[in-house]
Protein backbone atom coordinates (compact mmCIF):
# COMPACT_ATOMS: atom_id res chain seq x y z
CA UNK A 1 0.00 0.00 0.00
CA UNK A 2 2.87 2.31 0.81
CA UNK A 3 4.50 1.57 -2.56
CA UNK A 4 1.23 2.29 -4.33
CA UNK A 5 0.89 5.55 -2.47
CA UNK A 6 4.49 6.36 -3.33
CA UNK A 7 3.91 5.63 -7.00
CA UNK A 8 0.73 7.69 -7.04
CA UNK A 9 2.54 10.59 -5.36
CA UNK A 10 5.47 10.32 -7.76
CA UNK A 11 3.14 10.18 -10.77
CA UNK A 12 1.31 13.23 -9.47
CA UNK A 13 4.60 15.09 -8.98
CA UNK A 14 5.71 14.13 -12.47
CA UNK A 15 2.47 15.43 -13.92
CA UNK A 16 2.94 18.71 -12.05
CA UNK A 17 6.54 18.96 -13.31
CA UNK A 18 5.41 18.29 -16.86
CA UNK A 19 2.78 21.01 -16.60
CA UNK A 20 5.36 23.40 -15.19
CA UNK A 21 7.79 22.55 -17.98
CA UNK A 22 5.15 23.17 -20.58
CA UNK A 23 4.17 26.48 -19.05
CA UNK A 24 7.72 27.75 -18.49
CA UNK A 25 9.69 28.99 -21.48
CA UNK A 26 13.00 28.02 -19.84
CA UNK A 27 14.36 24.51 -19.22
CA UNK A 28 16.46 23.64 -16.16
CA UNK A 29 18.36 20.34 -16.62
CA UNK A 30 20.37 20.20 -13.40
CA UNK A 31 17.16 20.06 -11.29
CA UNK A 32 16.39 16.50 -12.50
CA UNK A 33 19.40 15.25 -10.55
CA UNK A 34 17.67 15.95 -7.19
CA UNK A 35 14.14 14.89 -8.13
CA UNK A 36 14.42 11.38 -6.66
CA UNK A 37 15.86 12.64 -3.39
CA UNK A 38 13.26 15.36 -3.08
CA UNK A 39 10.49 12.89 -3.83
CA UNK A 40 11.82 10.49 -1.21
CA UNK A 41 12.07 13.25 1.42
CA UNK A 42 8.53 14.42 0.59
CA UNK A 43 7.21 10.85 0.81
CA UNK A 44 8.89 10.34 4.19
CA UNK A 45 7.53 13.63 5.46
CA UNK A 46 4.02 12.80 4.25
CA UNK A 47 4.19 9.34 5.81
CA UNK A 48 5.40 10.89 9.07
CA UNK A 49 2.51 13.36 9.04
CA UNK A 50 0.09 10.55 8.30
CA UNK A 51 1.46 8.54 11.24
CA UNK A 52 1.02 11.56 13.47
CA UNK A 53 -2.63 11.92 12.44
CA UNK A 54 -3.38 8.17 12.80
CA UNK A 55 -4.86 6.71 16.01
CA UNK A 56 -2.87 4.42 18.25
CA UNK A 57 -4.44 1.18 17.12
CA UNK A 58 -3.80 2.07 13.43
CA UNK A 59 -0.06 2.62 13.83
CA UNK A 60 2.53 -0.14 13.02
CA UNK A 61 6.26 -0.65 13.50
CA UNK A 62 8.93 -0.63 10.79
CA UNK A 63 9.46 -4.40 11.01
CA UNK A 64 5.77 -5.15 10.55
CA UNK A 65 5.68 -2.85 7.55
CA UNK A 66 8.72 -4.59 6.05
CA UNK A 67 7.13 -8.00 6.60
CA UNK A 68 4.02 -6.87 4.84
CA UNK A 69 6.21 -5.81 1.87
CA UNK A 70 8.33 -8.99 1.82
CA UNK A 71 6.54 -10.28 -1.27
CA UNK A 72 8.07 -7.44 -3.25
CA UNK A 73 11.45 -9.20 -2.92
CA UNK A 74 10.06 -12.18 -4.82
CA UNK A 75 9.40 -10.07 -7.92
CA UNK A 76 13.06 -10.14 -9.02
CA UNK A 77 12.30 -12.32 -11.98
CA UNK A 78 10.63 -9.33 -13.60
CA UNK A 79 13.97 -7.53 -13.81
CA UNK A 80 14.91 -9.10 -17.15
CA UNK A 81 11.68 -8.05 -18.73
CA UNK A 82 12.64 -4.37 -18.45
CA UNK A 83 11.38 -1.43 -16.62
CA UNK A 84 8.18 -1.20 -18.62
CA UNK A 85 6.58 -4.07 -16.65
CA UNK A 86 7.28 -2.31 -13.33
CA UNK A 87 5.79 0.86 -14.65
CA UNK A 88 2.79 -1.05 -15.92
CA UNK A 89 2.28 -2.57 -12.50
CA UNK A 90 2.52 0.87 -10.90
CA UNK A 91 5.75 0.07 -9.00
CA UNK A 92 8.79 2.20 -8.50
CA UNK A 93 11.74 0.52 -10.36
CA UNK A 94 14.30 2.07 -8.01
CA UNK A 95 12.53 0.55 -5.01
CA UNK A 96 12.34 -2.83 -6.75
CA UNK A 97 16.06 -2.70 -7.56
CA UNK A 98 16.92 -1.78 -4.02
CA UNK A 99 14.83 -4.67 -2.66
CA UNK A 100 16.11 -7.26 -5.16
CA UNK A 101 19.80 -6.53 -5.07
CA UNK A 102 20.66 -9.37 -2.67
CA UNK A 103 17.78 -11.72 -3.58
CA UNK A 104 18.38 -15.41 -4.09
CA UNK A 105 17.82 -16.53 -7.72
CA UNK A 106 17.20 -20.15 -6.83
CA UNK A 107 13.48 -20.82 -6.29
CA UNK A 108 11.34 -23.90 -6.08
CA UNK A 109 8.09 -24.72 -7.87
CA UNK A 110 6.02 -23.88 -4.85
CA UNK A 111 7.70 -20.54 -4.62
CA UNK A 112 7.00 -19.94 -8.28
CA UNK A 113 3.37 -20.90 -7.79
CA UNK A 114 3.16 -18.58 -4.83
CA UNK A 115 4.77 -15.86 -6.85
CA UNK A 116 2.29 -16.41 -9.64
CA UNK A 117 -0.54 -16.36 -7.14
CA UNK A 118 0.76 -13.12 -5.74
CA UNK A 119 1.15 -11.75 -9.22
CA UNK A 120 -2.41 -12.66 -10.03
CA UNK A 121 -3.58 -11.02 -6.86
CA UNK A 122 -1.63 -7.91 -7.67
CA UNK A 123 -2.97 -7.78 -11.20
CA UNK A 124 -6.46 -8.32 -9.87
CA UNK A 125 -6.05 -5.51 -7.38
CA UNK A 126 -4.63 -3.26 -10.09
CA UNK A 127 -7.58 -4.01 -12.39
CA UNK A 128 -10.10 -3.34 -9.60
CA UNK A 129 -8.31 -0.11 -8.79
CA UNK A 130 -8.46 0.95 -12.42
CA UNK A 131 -12.15 0.14 -12.58
CA UNK A 132 -12.80 2.16 -9.46
CA UNK A 133 -10.71 5.00 -10.90
CA UNK A 134 -12.76 4.93 -14.10
CA UNK A 135 -15.97 4.86 -12.09
CA UNK A 136 -14.77 7.81 -10.06
CA UNK A 137 -13.81 9.62 -13.27
CA UNK A 138 -17.31 9.08 -14.65
CA UNK A 139 -18.77 10.35 -11.39
CA UNK A 140 -16.43 13.32 -11.54
CA UNK A 141 -17.60 14.07 -15.06
CA UNK A 142 -21.22 13.82 -13.99
CA UNK A 143 -20.55 16.10 -11.03
CA UNK A 144 -18.75 18.55 -13.29
CA UNK A 145 -21.76 18.62 -15.62
CA UNK A 146 -24.04 19.17 -12.65
CA UNK A 147 -21.78 21.92 -11.37
CA UNK A 148 -21.79 23.57 -14.78
CA UNK A 149 -25.57 23.43 -14.89
CA UNK A 150 -25.77 24.78 -11.35
CA UNK A 151 -23.35 27.55 -12.21
CA UNK A 152 -25.43 28.45 -15.23
CA UNK A 153 -28.55 28.42 -13.12
CA UNK A 154 -26.85 30.60 -10.54
CA UNK A 155 -25.91 33.06 -13.25
CA UNK A 156 -29.51 33.14 -14.45
CA UNK A 157 -30.71 33.60 -10.87
CA UNK A 158 -28.21 36.40 -10.35
CA UNK A 159 -29.45 38.13 -13.49
CA UNK A 160 -33.07 37.76 -12.40
CA UNK A 161 -32.21 38.97 -8.89
CA UNK A 162 -30.45 42.01 -10.33
CA UNK A 163 -33.54 42.70 -12.41
CA UNK A 164 -35.70 42.33 -9.31
CA UNK A 165 -33.43 44.71 -7.38
CA UNK A 166 -33.68 47.28 -10.15
CA UNK A 167 -37.47 47.00 -10.13
CA UNK A 168 -37.53 47.18 -6.33
CA UNK A 169 -35.33 50.28 -6.34
CA UNK A 170 -37.64 51.90 -8.85
CA UNK A 171 -40.69 51.04 -6.75
CA UNK A 172 -39.02 52.33 -3.57
CA UNK A 173 -38.18 55.60 -5.33
CA UNK A 174 -41.78 55.91 -6.49
CA UNK A 175 -43.02 55.10 -2.97
CA UNK A 176 -40.72 57.74 -1.45
CA UNK A 177 -42.03 60.30 -3.90
CA UNK A 178 -45.62 59.38 -3.03
CA UNK A 179 -44.83 59.48 0.72
CA UNK A 180 -43.24 62.92 0.37
CA UNK A 181 -46.30 64.13 -1.51
CA UNK A 182 -48.60 62.64 1.15
CA UNK A 183 -46.62 64.27 3.96
CA UNK A 184 -46.86 67.61 2.19
CA UNK A 185 -50.60 67.14 1.79
CA UNK A 186 -50.90 66.07 5.46
CA UNK A 187 -48.98 69.13 6.63
CA UNK A 188 -51.20 71.35 4.55
CA UNK A 189 -54.29 69.64 5.96
CA UNK A 190 -53.03 69.93 9.55
CA UNK A 191 -52.26 73.61 9.06
CA UNK A 192 -55.77 74.13 7.70
CA UNK A 193 -57.23 72.17 10.63
CA UNK A 194 -55.23 74.26 13.09
CA UNK A 195 -56.49 77.43 11.49
CA UNK A 196 -60.05 76.12 11.60
CA UNK A 197 -59.70 75.00 15.25
CA UNK A 198 -58.25 78.40 16.17
CA UNK A 199 -61.19 80.08 14.47
CA UNK A 200 -63.59 77.75 16.32
CA UNK A 201 -61.88 78.51 19.63
CA UNK A 202 -62.03 82.23 18.99
CA UNK A 203 -65.72 81.92 18.08
CA UNK A 204 -66.36 79.86 21.23
CA UNK A 205 -64.55 82.42 23.38
CA UNK A 206 -66.62 85.20 21.80
CA UNK A 207 -69.77 83.19 22.43
CA UNK A 208 -68.74 82.57 26.06
CA UNK A 209 -68.00 86.26 26.55
CA UNK A 210 -71.33 87.26 25.03
CA UNK A 211 -73.13 84.64 27.15
CA UNK A 212 -71.41 85.96 30.27
CA UNK A 213 -72.37 89.51 29.35
CA UNK A 214 -75.91 88.35 28.59
CA UNK A 215 -76.16 86.66 31.99
CA UNK A 216 -74.79 89.75 33.71
CA UNK A 217 -77.21 92.01 31.84
CA UNK A 218 -80.09 89.65 32.58
CA UNK A 219 -79.13 89.70 36.26
CA UNK A 220 -79.14 93.48 36.15
CA UNK A 221 -82.51 93.39 34.39
CA UNK A 222 -83.91 90.96 36.97
CA UNK A 223 -82.55 93.18 39.72
CA UNK A 224 -84.31 96.21 38.23
CA UNK A 225 -87.47 94.13 37.83
CA UNK A 226 -87.25 93.17 41.50
CA UNK A 227 -86.97 96.83 42.46
CA UNK A 228 -89.99 97.80 40.35
CA UNK A 229 -93.54 97.70 41.87
CA UNK A 230 -95.58 94.50 41.73
CA UNK A 231 -98.45 96.02 39.76
CA UNK A 232 -96.11 97.18 37.03
CA UNK A 233 -94.47 93.74 36.94
CA UNK A 234 -97.87 92.04 36.58
CA UNK A 235 -98.87 94.43 33.78
CA UNK A 236 -95.63 93.82 31.91
CA UNK A 237 -95.99 90.07 32.25
CA UNK A 238 -99.58 90.20 30.97
CA UNK A 239 -98.50 92.29 28.00
CA UNK A 240 -95.76 89.84 27.15
CA UNK A 241 -98.18 86.94 27.51
CA UNK A 242 -100.60 88.57 25.11
CA UNK A 243 -97.89 89.49 22.62
CA UNK A 244 -96.32 86.02 22.60
CA UNK A 245 -99.11 83.45 22.84
CA UNK A 246 -96.96 80.82 21.22
CA UNK A 247 -94.58 80.89 24.17
CA UNK A 248 -95.66 78.27 26.75
CA UNK A 249 -93.21 79.43 29.38
CA UNK A 250 -94.82 82.77 30.29
CA UNK A 251 -98.06 81.33 31.77
CA UNK A 252 -95.96 79.19 34.09
CA UNK A 253 -93.92 82.27 34.98
CA UNK A 254 -97.11 84.23 35.78
CA UNK A 255 -98.48 81.40 37.91
CA UNK A 256 -95.23 81.07 39.82
CA UNK A 257 -95.00 84.83 40.13
CA UNK A 258 -98.48 85.06 41.69
CA UNK A 259 -97.69 82.22 44.13
CA UNK A 260 -94.42 83.84 45.13
CA UNK A 261 -96.07 87.23 45.65
CA UNK A 262 -98.72 85.70 47.93
CA UNK A 263 -96.04 83.85 49.88
CA UNK A 264 -93.99 87.03 50.08
CA UNK A 265 -96.90 89.00 51.57
CA UNK A 266 -97.61 86.34 54.15
CA UNK A 267 -93.95 86.03 55.06
CA UNK A 268 -93.59 89.80 55.37
CA UNK A 269 -96.59 90.01 57.72
CA UNK A 270 -95.34 87.14 59.83
CA UNK A 271 -91.84 88.62 59.92
CA UNK A 272 -93.27 91.95 61.03
CA UNK A 273 -95.25 90.35 63.84
CA UNK A 274 -92.40 88.15 65.03
CA UNK A 275 -89.83 90.92 64.86
CA UNK A 276 -92.07 93.38 66.70
CA UNK A 277 -92.90 90.87 69.44
CA UNK A 278 -89.30 89.83 69.92
CA UNK A 279 -88.15 93.42 69.87
CA UNK A 280 -90.69 94.50 72.47
CA UNK A 281 -90.01 91.54 74.75
CA UNK A 282 -86.25 92.00 74.51
CA UNK A 283 -86.40 95.70 75.15
CA UNK A 284 -88.89 95.22 78.00
CA UNK A 285 -86.55 92.78 79.69
CA UNK A 286 -83.59 95.10 79.35
CA UNK A 287 -85.36 97.94 81.21
CA UNK A 288 -85.53 101.64 80.76
CA UNK A 289 -81.88 102.27 80.12
CA UNK A 290 -82.38 101.81 76.37
CA UNK A 291 -85.76 103.50 76.08
CA UNK A 292 -84.79 106.25 73.71
CA UNK A 293 -82.80 103.92 71.57
CA UNK A 294 -85.78 101.54 71.42
CA UNK A 295 -88.09 104.27 70.20
CA UNK A 296 -85.61 105.31 67.53
CA UNK A 297 -85.13 101.76 66.37
CA UNK A 298 -88.88 101.10 66.31
CA UNK A 299 -89.47 104.22 64.24
CA UNK A 300 -86.73 103.27 61.81
CA UNK A 301 -88.01 99.71 61.64
CA UNK A 302 -91.55 100.85 60.97
CA UNK A 303 -90.30 103.11 58.21
CA UNK A 304 -88.24 100.26 56.85
CA UNK A 305 -91.13 97.78 56.84
CA UNK A 306 -93.53 100.31 55.27
CA UNK A 307 -91.40 100.69 52.17
CA UNK A 308 -93.04 100.46 48.74
CA UNK A 309 -94.35 97.22 47.40
CA UNK A 310 -91.35 96.96 45.13
CA UNK A 311 -89.15 96.49 48.19
CA UNK A 312 -91.41 93.83 49.68
CA UNK A 313 -91.30 91.78 46.47
CA UNK A 314 -87.62 90.87 46.56
CA UNK A 315 -88.45 87.20 46.18
CA UNK A 316 -91.15 87.78 43.55
CA UNK A 317 -88.89 86.95 40.60
CA UNK A 318 -86.66 84.31 42.17
CA UNK A 319 -87.76 81.83 39.49
CA UNK A 320 -85.78 83.78 36.89
CA UNK A 321 -82.54 82.91 38.64
CA UNK A 322 -83.58 79.56 40.17
CA UNK A 323 -84.45 78.14 36.77
CA UNK A 324 -82.06 78.05 33.88
CA UNK A 325 -81.84 81.11 31.66
CA UNK A 326 -85.05 80.88 29.65
CA UNK A 327 -84.82 81.93 26.05
CA UNK A 328 -87.68 84.28 25.30
CA UNK A 329 -88.13 87.48 23.31
CA UNK A 330 -88.78 90.31 25.72
CA UNK A 331 -88.55 94.00 25.01
CA UNK A 332 -86.14 95.69 27.40
CA UNK A 333 -88.60 97.90 29.31
CA UNK A 334 -87.53 99.56 32.57
CA UNK A 335 -89.79 101.08 35.20
CA UNK A 336 -87.24 103.62 36.34
CA UNK A 337 -86.93 106.55 33.95
CA UNK A 338 -84.58 108.70 36.00
CA UNK A 339 -81.54 107.73 38.10
CA UNK A 340 -82.94 109.65 41.07
CA UNK A 341 -85.78 107.15 41.40
CA UNK A 342 -83.31 104.27 41.58
CA UNK A 343 -81.17 106.21 44.07
CA UNK A 344 -84.23 106.78 46.25
CA UNK A 345 -84.97 103.05 46.20
CA UNK A 346 -81.34 102.34 47.10
CA UNK A 347 -81.48 104.79 50.02
CA UNK A 348 -84.61 103.08 51.33
CA UNK A 349 -82.92 99.70 50.97
CA UNK A 350 -79.84 101.04 52.74
CA UNK A 351 -81.96 102.30 55.64
CA UNK A 352 -83.66 98.95 55.87
CA UNK A 353 -80.28 97.19 55.82
CA UNK A 354 -79.03 99.50 58.57
CA UNK A 355 -82.03 98.67 60.73
CA UNK A 356 -81.49 94.99 60.10
CA UNK A 357 -77.80 95.32 60.93
CA UNK A 358 -78.65 97.14 64.15
CA UNK A 359 -81.21 94.50 64.96
CA UNK A 360 -78.68 91.75 64.28
CA UNK A 361 -76.15 93.50 66.53
CA UNK A 362 -78.73 93.72 69.31
CA UNK A 363 -79.56 90.08 68.82
CA UNK A 364 -75.87 89.23 69.00
CA UNK A 365 -75.52 91.20 72.24
CA UNK A 366 -78.55 89.46 73.73
CA UNK A 367 -77.22 86.14 72.55
CA UNK A 368 -73.88 86.89 74.17
CA UNK A 369 -75.63 87.81 77.43
CA UNK A 370 -77.67 84.64 77.25
CA UNK A 371 -74.52 82.62 76.61
CA UNK A 372 -72.80 84.23 79.59
CA UNK A 373 -75.82 83.57 81.79
CA UNK A 374 -76.00 80.02 80.54
CA UNK A 375 -72.31 79.53 81.22
CA UNK A 376 -72.70 80.97 84.73
CA UNK A 377 -75.68 78.71 85.42
CA UNK A 378 -73.82 75.73 84.02
CA UNK A 379 -70.80 76.48 86.22
CA UNK A 380 -73.07 76.85 89.23
CA UNK A 381 -74.78 73.57 88.44
CA UNK A 382 -71.42 71.87 88.02
CA UNK A 383 -70.24 73.28 91.35
CA UNK A 384 -73.42 72.12 93.05
CA UNK A 385 -73.03 68.69 91.50
CA UNK A 386 -69.42 68.46 92.65
CA UNK A 387 -70.41 69.66 96.15
CA UNK A 388 -73.24 67.13 96.30
CA UNK A 389 -70.92 64.38 95.14
CA UNK A 390 -68.41 65.33 97.82
CA UNK A 391 -71.19 65.49 100.40
CA UNK A 392 -72.41 62.10 99.23
CA UNK A 393 -68.93 60.69 99.56
CA UNK A 394 -68.59 62.25 103.02
CA UNK A 395 -71.96 60.84 104.12
CA UNK A 396 -70.94 57.45 102.84
CA UNK A 397 -67.70 57.64 104.80
CA UNK A 398 -69.65 58.75 107.88
CA UNK A 399 -72.04 55.85 107.44
CA UNK A 400 -69.14 53.45 107.20
CA UNK A 401 -67.55 55.03 110.28
CA UNK A 402 -70.82 54.77 112.21
CA UNK A 403 -71.22 51.16 111.14
CA UNK A 404 -67.71 50.46 112.42
CA UNK A 405 -68.57 52.21 115.68
CA UNK A 406 -71.78 50.20 115.99
CA UNK A 407 -69.87 46.99 115.40
CA UNK A 408 -67.29 48.03 117.98
CA UNK A 409 -70.01 48.91 120.47
CA UNK A 410 -71.72 45.62 119.80
CA UNK A 411 -68.44 43.84 120.44
CA UNK A 412 -67.92 45.83 123.62
CA UNK A 413 -71.44 45.03 124.77
CA UNK A 414 -70.80 41.37 124.17
CA UNK A 415 -67.55 41.57 126.07
CA UNK A 416 -69.34 43.51 128.78
CA UNK A 417 -72.09 40.91 129.08
CA UNK A 418 -69.63 38.02 128.93
CA UNK A 419 -69.14 36.06 132.11
CA UNK A 420 -71.11 36.44 135.31
CA UNK A 421 -73.93 38.98 135.14
CA UNK A 422 -73.51 41.63 137.82
CA UNK A 423 -76.45 44.01 137.81
CA UNK A 424 -75.01 46.37 140.40
CA UNK A 425 -71.82 46.86 138.42
CA UNK A 426 -73.81 47.46 135.22
CA UNK A 427 -76.04 49.94 136.98
CA UNK A 428 -73.02 51.79 138.24
CA UNK A 429 -71.50 51.76 134.75
CA UNK A 430 -74.74 53.06 133.20
CA UNK A 431 -74.97 55.83 135.79
CA UNK A 432 -71.41 56.88 135.10
CA UNK A 433 -72.11 56.85 131.33
CA UNK A 434 -75.22 58.97 131.76
CA UNK A 435 -73.24 61.45 133.85
CA UNK A 436 -70.59 61.68 131.14
CA UNK A 437 -73.28 62.11 128.47
CA UNK A 438 -74.84 64.93 130.52
CA UNK A 439 -71.48 66.61 130.80
CA UNK A 440 -70.90 66.34 127.05
CA UNK A 441 -74.44 67.59 126.34
CA UNK A 442 -73.95 70.64 128.62
CA UNK A 443 -70.64 71.42 126.92
CA UNK A 444 -71.91 70.98 123.35
CA UNK A 445 -75.53 72.19 123.51
CA UNK A 446 -76.28 73.73 126.93
CA UNK A 447 -78.23 73.21 130.16
CA UNK A 448 -81.64 73.31 128.46
CA UNK A 449 -83.63 70.05 128.27
CA UNK A 450 -81.06 68.10 130.23
CA UNK A 451 -83.55 66.33 132.47
CA UNK A 452 -86.35 65.85 129.89
CA UNK A 453 -84.27 63.78 127.40
CA UNK A 454 -82.84 60.34 127.78
CA UNK A 455 -79.23 59.37 127.03
CA UNK A 456 -79.86 58.18 123.44
CA UNK A 457 -81.66 61.40 122.44
CA UNK A 458 -78.88 63.43 123.99
CA UNK A 459 -76.33 61.45 121.99
CA UNK A 460 -78.34 62.04 118.77
CA UNK A 461 -78.43 65.80 119.43
CA UNK A 462 -74.73 65.80 120.25
CA UNK A 463 -74.01 63.96 117.00
CA UNK A 464 -76.09 66.41 114.94
CA UNK A 465 -74.30 69.27 116.68
CA UNK A 466 -70.97 67.67 115.83
CA UNK A 467 -72.01 67.38 112.17
CA UNK A 468 -72.93 71.07 112.13
CA UNK A 469 -69.66 71.99 113.76
CA UNK A 470 -67.74 69.88 111.23
CA UNK A 471 -69.54 71.69 108.40
CA UNK A 472 -68.70 75.01 110.02
CA UNK A 473 -65.09 73.92 110.39
CA UNK A 474 -64.97 73.35 106.64
CA UNK A 475 -66.17 76.90 106.05
CA UNK A 476 -63.58 78.37 108.47
CA UNK A 477 -60.25 79.33 106.83
CA UNK A 478 -57.61 76.69 106.96
CA UNK A 479 -55.14 78.88 108.85
CA UNK A 480 -57.50 79.42 111.82
CA UNK A 481 -58.34 75.72 111.96
CA UNK A 482 -54.68 74.77 111.99
CA UNK A 483 -53.96 77.33 114.75
CA UNK A 484 -56.81 75.96 116.89
CA UNK A 485 -55.64 72.39 116.30
CA UNK A 486 -52.13 73.34 117.38
CA UNK A 487 -53.50 74.89 120.60
CA UNK A 488 -55.62 71.82 121.30
CA UNK A 489 -52.69 69.51 120.70
CA UNK A 490 -50.55 71.63 122.98
CA UNK A 491 -53.19 71.45 125.76
CA UNK A 492 -53.58 67.71 125.24
CA UNK A 493 -49.85 67.14 125.49
CA UNK A 494 -49.72 69.30 128.65
CA UNK A 495 -52.55 67.31 130.18
CA UNK A 496 -50.87 64.02 129.29
CA UNK A 497 -47.64 65.21 130.89
CA UNK A 498 -49.53 66.19 134.08
CA UNK A 499 -51.30 62.82 134.18
CA UNK A 500 -48.00 61.01 133.71
CA UNK A 501 -46.46 63.00 136.57
CA UNK A 502 -49.43 62.21 138.81
CA UNK A 503 -49.26 58.53 137.85
CA UNK A 504 -45.56 58.45 138.55
CA UNK A 505 -46.04 60.16 141.93
CA UNK A 506 -48.83 57.75 142.87
CA UNK A 507 -46.70 54.80 141.83
CA UNK A 508 -43.85 56.05 144.04
CA UNK A 509 -46.24 56.48 146.97
CA UNK A 510 -47.53 52.94 146.48
CA UNK A 511 -43.98 51.61 146.42
CA UNK A 512 -43.11 53.46 149.62
CA UNK A 513 -46.26 52.19 151.27
CA UNK A 514 -45.52 48.61 150.20
CA UNK A 515 -41.94 48.95 151.45
CA UNK A 516 -43.17 50.20 154.83
CA UNK A 517 -45.67 47.35 155.06
CA UNK A 518 -42.97 44.82 154.23
CA UNK A 519 -40.70 46.37 156.86
CA UNK A 520 -43.38 46.24 159.54
CA UNK A 521 -44.84 42.80 158.63
CA UNK A 522 -43.53 39.60 160.13
CA UNK A 523 -41.57 37.32 157.79
CA UNK A 524 -43.50 34.37 156.35
CA UNK A 525 -42.23 30.92 156.70
CA UNK A 526 -42.35 28.75 153.58
CA UNK A 527 -43.65 25.28 154.23
CA UNK A 528 -43.09 22.46 151.78
CA UNK A 529 -41.87 22.52 148.23
CA UNK A 530 -42.76 25.26 145.79
CA UNK A 531 -45.51 24.31 143.31
CA UNK A 532 -44.91 24.15 139.57
CA UNK A 533 -46.54 26.84 137.48
CA UNK A 534 -48.87 24.45 135.70
CA UNK A 535 -50.05 22.96 138.97
CA UNK A 536 -50.74 26.34 140.52
CA UNK A 537 -54.50 26.71 141.17
CA UNK A 538 -56.43 29.69 139.85
CA UNK A 539 -57.00 32.59 142.14
CA UNK A 540 -60.51 32.87 143.51
CA UNK A 541 -60.39 36.69 143.45
CA UNK A 542 -62.96 38.17 141.06
CA UNK A 543 -62.04 41.09 138.87
CA UNK A 544 -64.24 44.01 139.65
CA UNK A 545 -65.60 46.15 136.80
CA UNK A 546 -64.02 49.55 136.83
CA UNK A 547 -66.10 52.68 136.49
CA UNK A 548 -65.72 55.10 133.62
CA UNK A 549 -64.21 57.71 135.89
CA UNK A 550 -61.51 55.27 137.05
CA UNK A 551 -60.43 54.05 133.61
CA UNK A 552 -57.06 55.33 132.39
CA UNK A 553 -57.21 54.09 128.78
CA UNK A 554 -59.49 56.27 126.66
CA UNK A 555 -60.49 55.90 123.06
CA UNK A 556 -59.48 58.31 120.35
CA UNK A 557 -62.92 59.88 120.12
CA UNK A 558 -63.04 60.53 123.88
CA UNK A 559 -59.60 62.14 123.80
CA UNK A 560 -60.68 64.32 120.86
CA UNK A 561 -64.02 65.43 122.39
CA UNK A 562 -63.13 65.71 126.12
CA UNK A 563 -59.55 66.93 126.01
UniProtKB/Swiss-Prot annotation:
Keyword line: Cell projection, Cilium, Coiled coil, Cytoplasm, Cytoskeleton, Differentiation, Flagellum, Spermatogenesis
* Top-rank taxon, per record: Eukaryota
- One GO CC term of this entry? sperm flagellum
Q: Which GO terms describe its biological process?
A: acrosome assembly; intraciliary anterograde transport; sperm flagellum assembly; spermatogenesis
From the UniProt record, list the coiled-coil ranges.
128-211, 361-415, 454-522
Query: What GO terms are given for molecular function?
Result: ubiquitin-modified histone reader activity
User: Where in the sequence does UniProt note compositional bias of the Basic and acidic residues kind?
Assistant: 269-281
Q: In which tissues is it expressed?
A: Expressed exclusively in testis where it is detected mainly in spermatogonia and spermatocytes (at protein level).
Q: Which Pfam families match?
A: DUF4200
Cysteine disulfide partners in this protein: none
Gene disruption: observed consequences: Mutant males are infertile. They exhibit normal mounting behaviors and produce coital plugs but fail to produce any offspring after mating with wild-type adult females. Significantly reduced sperm count and motility with spermatozoa displaying morphological abnormalities including short or absent flagella, abnormal nuclei, disordered filaments, abnormally long manchettes and abnormal sperm heads. Impaired fibrous sheaths and disorganized axonemes in sperm flagella. Sperm heads display acrosomal dysplasia. Significantly reduced levels of Cfap53, Ift88, Ift20 and Odf2 in the testis.
**Residues annotated as region Disordered?**
265-310, 543-563
Can the keyword Coiled coil be found in this entry's annotation? yes
Q: Where in the cell is it found?
A: Cytoplasm, Cytoskeleton, Microtubule organizing center, Centrosome; Cytoplasm, Perinuclear region; Cell projection, Cilium, Flagellum; Cytoplasm, Cytoskeleton
Q: Has keyword Cytoplasm?
A: yes
Q: How does it assemble?
A: Interacts with CCDC42, CFAP53, IFT88 and ODF2. Interacts with CCDC146. Interacts with TEKT3. Interacts with ubiquitinated histone H2A.
The free-text function statement in the UniProt record for this protein reads: Essential for male fertility. Required for sperm flagellum biogenesis. Also required for acrosome biogenesis. Required for the attachment of developing acrosomes to the nucleus during spermiogenesis and may be involved in the transport of fibrous sheath components.
The protein in question is named Coiled-coil domain-containing protein 38
* Organism per entry: Mus musculus (Mouse)
Amino acid sequence: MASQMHTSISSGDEGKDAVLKKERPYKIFFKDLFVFKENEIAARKKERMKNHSMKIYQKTTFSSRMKSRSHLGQLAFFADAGSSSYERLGLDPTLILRLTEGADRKRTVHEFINDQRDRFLLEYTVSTKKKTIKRFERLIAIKENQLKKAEKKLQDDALSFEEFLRENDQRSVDALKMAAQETINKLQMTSELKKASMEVQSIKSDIAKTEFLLKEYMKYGFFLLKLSPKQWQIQQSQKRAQSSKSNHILPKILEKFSINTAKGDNSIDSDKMSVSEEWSSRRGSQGGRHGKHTLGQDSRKSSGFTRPESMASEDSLEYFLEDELVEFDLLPEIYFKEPEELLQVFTELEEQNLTLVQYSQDVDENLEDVNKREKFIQDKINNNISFLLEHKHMLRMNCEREEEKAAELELRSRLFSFGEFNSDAQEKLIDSLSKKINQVYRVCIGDAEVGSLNAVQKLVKVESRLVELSDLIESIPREHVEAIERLKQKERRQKLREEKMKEKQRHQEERLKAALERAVAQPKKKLGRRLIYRSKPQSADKQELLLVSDTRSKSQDEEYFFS
